[in-house]
Amino acid sequence: MSSRNAKLLYRHLEAENAQDLNGTLATLHPDCVFQDHATGQLWRGHSGAADHYRQWWTTFDVTVERLADQSAGWPDENTFIAEAAWKGRHVGEFLGIPASGRDILQRFVVVVGFQDGLMTSERFHYDLASLLRQTGSNVVPDIGSLPYSIMSA
């Protein structure tokens, strides 16, 4: 584990949980890539990362937490893998589903890459159907038409 990367990750999570876009972007490499495997979306660069965070922050008022039964580790100095959870409330439209005001606790796995002292990638894996049920929906929407969809290409 690189202590520099661990400190950067901590700064990133503090900024992300505070919904501080400038602070969050300051931890990211200019060529960063974010991939949401559940929705099939891919964002590139600071502009894409900003859109990624805005999408989530206007939809869910959540913090990223690691629960007691979850683990994390560094398989090498430039890769961090963690089980974590989004904990909060559904406050805005998500995949065409209006804000429900419901509480959510969504477990996920994230793989984070590092290069040149910055985060280069985040790859998210989670159960979309579980998240949709927590918003009050049992219908999986057409995710191929989402902005940044890799499925519509």
What are the language-model segments listed below?
Residues 1-153:
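C-terminal and inter-domain tail/linker signature
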